[in-house]
Amino acid sequence: MGQIPMPGGWSMAAMWLPVCGQSWLGAAAGFIGMWAAMMVPMMLPLAVAPLLNYRATLAGEGKAFLLTAIAGLAWAATWMASGLPVYLAGAAVARALLAMPALARMMPVLAAVAGVAGAAWHLAAWRRRPLHPGLPGPPVCAAALRHGACLGAHCVRRCSGLTVALLAAGIMERSTMVCAVVLVAAESVRLRER
């Protein structure tokens, strides 16, 4: 991923802006593809326990595996869809930073503050959030889609602080990704223990 040198001695990821000859729609589609390839597998451990609980409630149903798979796909689609507002916000910030060099010089400090605040919010909210939303009604495809989307929306909200910290620290930095994966894995283990 290319970098754009910015005032203040730091560089911004080029993924927030269309490259030469690319439309904004193409840039957004590229980002959402990258977002899906990165966030869905990283956050998947958090979906395992609720999906296993859902499958357990369908015990005795002939379509339990299929309905659980449909709920899992709806969960993944919700995470993919969450990439669009992230891209729109990132693109707006990137445009503002290119237009306002004074703001660009302050960005490393602002990113550090946002990263610490996002991580603190994630850790503080960790204990008080519910494990997962209530289970749906009759076991049909629409209910499985609705349940998976509800689980996905809950997971996106639950991980919003972590997402802010990840974006502030540099979404494509390996060390940042490793820290996020370790945190998600630890939270997944903790949720399964409850």
Q: Residue spans of the language-model regions?
A:
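Alpha-helical transmembrane segments of multi-pass membrane proteins
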Residues: 35-38, 114-122, 184-188
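Membrane-interfacial catalytic/cofactor-binding modules of polytopic membrane enzymes
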Residues: 124-162
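Residue-level signature of transmembrane alpha-helical entry/exit and packing/kink sites
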Residues: 23-31, 67, 71, 108-111, ...
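Generic transmembrane alpha-helix signature in multi-pass membrane proteins
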Residues: 37, 47-53, 147-153, 159-168
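Membrane helix-loop-helix hairpins that form the core translocation module of multi-pass transporters
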Residues: 1-3, 66-126
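A small-residue-rich subset of transmembrane alpha-helices
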Residues: 63-92, 158-193
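Juxtamembrane transmembrane-helix termini in multi-pass membrane transport proteins
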Residues: 23, 31-76
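Histidine-/acidic- and/or cysteine-rich, low-complexity loops and terminal segments associated
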Residues: 1-36, 94-106, 125-141
